[in-house]
Amino acid sequence: MNNRSTRQSGVALVLVLSLAAVLGLLVLQLALTAKSQTSRAQSLIDRAEADLLARSASADLSFCLLTATWVESKSQTSDGIAANSLPAVWNFRSEIFSLNGVEFAIQDVAGLLPLPRRGEATLPLVSLMEQLGIEKARAEEVGRVAYQYQVDPANLPLQDIYELGQLAGLSAEEIDRLRPFVTVVPSFTFNPGTAPVPVLKTRYQGSALEGLLALRGDGALDAAGYASVLGIGGDEFIEFYPGPALRWQVVAEVGDARSTVESTVLIRPYEYEPFLPWAQRRVASSKEAT
């Protein structure tokens, strides 16, 4: 009787220990699940806040540019932003600066290389691609495709760099290299003060290029300096104030989330439509995505 009672007690103890182990594993699983859900919820909150912060900062930037002091260009073709009307840290050459924990990069579209339109020469595009490390034969083929597509059979202008990339078979890496330097926004003037160096090299060489870079480095590139370096008089298609077309990128981070908003806009404070969005896109939503 005692042996039977002992065996029953042993079985009961095993059952209790097994039940305790199962309950322990269940509690552990619930704890891990709760932790995972909490982490995921926080990630979603951070992503939403980062996106809101980036969009709000982009809107603030738009308002600031709309209310900045503008000056009339001598060419009478556009207006420009007076450099001394904005904070000193600002620039229009895509050099990153930070304000209130948000990163900004603003590029004057007049300093970029327009993708060739119908009937236009493709040599500047080919030259730019070679500077960016793309083989000459490959660059020339892209130029040929850009020209031919707009003549026959489509007879349409290129919509963006991604369309050209698809037509010419450019890789994602090649598009990423080319994209910061080109635009499809129509521009009738060129701004050597805001142009990236590779774009400058598609228009100027030798001592002219060196002289312009020296003046720009000293913050002294204006109409008089330009004329002195190139040995020519005024040029109505050369501009020295940024605008009215601008492209900017705003990057905001909250926790592990990162949101990037990129916009291209026309800002013309004295026109009937002072603010005209051209394009906007979200580049990435988190650090992992970049």
Task: Go through the PLM ranges and name each one.
Residues 2-3, 11-290:
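Compositionally biased linear targeting/interaction segments
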Residues 8:
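Glycine-rich phosphate-binding loop
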